[in-house]
Structure formats: C-alpha cells, structure tokens
Amino acid sequence: MITIVLMLPTAVYVHLRLPGIRRLMEGITILPIVIPPVVLIVGVLQIAPGPLKGTPYLLALEYVVLAMPFAYRAIDAGLRSLDLKTIVEASNSLGAGWARTLLRVLLPNLRTAVLAAVVLTVALVLGEYTMASLALYQTFPVWIYVNSQTSGQVSVAASLLALLVTWIFLMGITVLGTRQSRRTGGGSVTLFTVARQETRGN
C-alpha cells in the first residue's frame, strides 16, 4: 500500500509536469532490480535511523524500495493508455482540485493498473526471502524454508496456498480489466459525476 501511495502521485506528476524526465525515472526505478538484495539491505541498515533498526518498519521500507520498479511500471502503463492532460484539464475546469482529481477521476480510470501493481507487490513479498532472512525476520517465505527442514508437507502446502492466492488475484485483475475495456466513456462518466457534484454544491 505504501508503494502505491508513493508511486501513483509520482507517476502522474511526471507524466503531467515533467515528461522530459520519464526515461530518467524509468532508470531510477529499475535500480532496485539491478542492485543485489544483499547490498540493498546492507545499505538500508547503514542509513536507517537508529529507532528503525531492529523493527518491522525497516523491513517494510526495504520492501517498498524492492517493489518500486514493478509498481511504477504498472501504473506508468496505465497512464500511457489515458489522455491524461485532457482528463486533468477537464476535471480542473469543473472545479475539482488536485487531490479530488487524483482520487475521483484518475484512480477509477487506473483501477486495473493499480490492482496490477498491488498484485505484483504482493507476489514479490510472498516470494522474497533474502532480505527477510538477513534482517532476521520470519516472514512467510522464511517460515516456509524453516519448516521445509522439518516438515516438507507443510512447506509444500503453504507454497501451493501462496500460488493459489496470487492466481486468484491475477484472475480478478483479468476480469476487471476485461470489464473496463468493454465500457465506453469511462472517463466521461467520472467527469460527469464530478460536474454533477459541483453543480449540487453550488
């Protein structure tokens, strides 16, 4: 969730205000994939404030950095499919501010992209072992590995459960994406809703 909250406004702002640095942003966001997890966790431990060390919040921060490339690219792909500038200008002309435009206009149109980013992040966390083991936290992948040493059946069942949950999420995104593609004028409907609410407010 933290990854989505950070990446969605960032991607929208880059597309609207700073289109010239889109390639630079793509290069920056891909760094967590290039840098080995061991180097990443050691670097985070070096720069992290003292109160965060040894807490689950530090591991959450590391997962945010690790999931950033996948979340940003999923949202970026969704933004490329929209006439973003026209939608935002139309929303602003109806009196909607930046926050309202983002939450009430852009987010519904980016529902499939955001869900894809969520699923990719969840799948990454469910399969990430190195960071959690080095940080001495028993996350789901670490628990599976530890139990595989004593009970192979339990670890296999847990792995299948993780695959099943990920598959269900992916199927849900596919269904939502299919429904959204069949609709026409989805952005116009959202803008009409904003206009109607503004009219009522006046």
Give, region by region, the residue ranges found by the protein language model.
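Glycine-rich helix-loop "coupling/hinge" segments at transmembrane-helix boundaries
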Residues: 125-153, 186-192
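Ca2+-coordinating acidic residues in Ca2+-binding motifs
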Residues: 89, 139, 159
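Short glycine/proline-centered loop/turn elements that form peptide/ligand docking sites
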Residues: 82-87
